[in-house]
Amino acid sequence: MKITAIETIQNKNFSNLVWVKIHTNEGITGLGETFRNPNAIVSYIHESCAPYLLGKDPLRFNEHADNLLNWTANRYIGYPTRSVEYRGNSAIDIALWDLKAKSSNLK
């Protein structure tokens, strides 16, 4: 299974929320969410997370979490990330776990 697309979803009625939907070549999707500073999170997900994740196995979520947290481009003043990255990574992580549950037929 490979990640084919990462979609961000926003709703004007819940303007601080961002949902992240990860699509795979097997038609299985995973949904995650995060809160606060939605425009920055959407930019981070599409500009940083998506290029890293596209084409990768979504079930290697521990590897992806570690790489996104410690990715050199995400370092700021010597620290791994800032709050936007933590929130974006959290939404990605939730979506990957959701995808794992769905691919395992867990309900």
Task: Identify what each model region corresponds to.
Residues 1-35:
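Structured beta-strand/loop patches that form or line metal/cofactor-binding pockets in enzymes
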Residues 23-103, 107:
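Metal- or metallocofactor-binding catalytic centers and their adjacent structured scaffolds
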